[in-house]
Amino acid sequence: MCWTNYIAIPLVLKKPLRVYKVGTLSIFCGFISLFRDFRYRESQTMPTVKINPKFTRCNLFVPGYKPQMWDTFYIHEGYHSYLTEEMAKYSMNEYDDIGVFEIPAGATVYVNYRHREIVSTDIRYLGSLKE
């Protein structure tokens, strides 16, 4: 999962936020995220990471058409999650599991509301989603 959006505004959470990740449950290390193979143990808060949005200006030139330009921000680092259970279910396949996580108050986040994705500086694994 690579977070992209046309704006990148950092928000600091005033209260904890529940989010969801797609990955694999493991009896040895809790939950393994599909994104970057991060490993999470239940109730363990992960180390704080720094997030640096990268800016890119894209140009599209097609002969006979008006040139188009758009700006995009990319975020590769940080803890990538989904805001809703439905979006996590939509992004998984039959072999994946969904983990429930909490972004603690005070964490910095970047939100893409259109894709219901969020990137945070801190996160804690709460357990697997029970269906």
What are the language-model segments listed below?
Residues 1-79, 83-131:
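Conserved NAD+-utilizing ADP-ribose enzyme module
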